[in-house]
Amino acid sequence: MQKLLGLMRRCIDDYDMIRENDRIAVGVSGGKDSLVLLQLLAELRKFFNKPFALEAITIDMGLGMDYSGIAALCEKLDVPFHLIKTEIGPIIFEHRKEKNPCSLCSKMRRGALNQAILDLGFNKLALGHHYDDAVETFVMSLIYEGRISCFQPVTDLDRTGIIQIRPMLYIHEKTVDNFAKRMELPVVENRCPVDKSTKREEIKQLIFDLSQTYPDLKERIFGAMQRFPLPEWEPHGRYKRPKEQE
């Protein structure tokens, strides 16, 4: 855990993600990424030099998923847990019968999450995007939209006053996977009908295939995003790429 905390601490410091007395909500979907983020932030809270409040929010899509494991983990970590019930799943798959539901689903989930954050009085939302997510998003934007773009480490949502932070951007996906298994985190089974059949999965496979020939591909892309840099991607400290992790 110390290695992951070190990478997270460096990312937080590089982008000034956490300030004193922040009220941070972790968006917990039930997937491994958000659960690892929750575990690490709960641990970081114990010794970080800037005190901050931490709570967890889960948006229940109305697809019959069991979130009791998340509630138990939050109790163990002494992190208040908020389960926000919605009918997003039935609206998309039963009423609207969307053929390409991912975009609408994402917008509706973001809307529900942002509203919950405002209602509960948080000023920051921590999201579980990791190193590989950033690389995949960059390649997706290039291939599907013809844009040099990616989400930002810190995003200020002007209309709401919410600031999104992504503290795990220096942590590789396989490191997240291994940590989640080692800690036996309560990953929730995803009952989305289109899970694993998205454009992101296609790009993930493409990057994997290219990496067999170009082993440093992901590191080159991530480094270019910081050195170019993309908007808001230039770190405050001297860039030192995250090395391959166990």
Regions found by a protein language model. Name each.
Residues M1-E136, Y144, K174-R182:
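ATP-dependent adenylation/nucleotidyltransferase module used to activate substrates
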Residues M61-L63, I88-P90, T155-D158, I171, ...:
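Residue-level detector of flexible, active-site-proximal loop/helix-junction positions
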Residues L185-E246:
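The feature marks non-catalytic terminal segments
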Residues S106-L120, V154-T160, I207, S211-Q226:
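Short, basic, helix/turn surface patches
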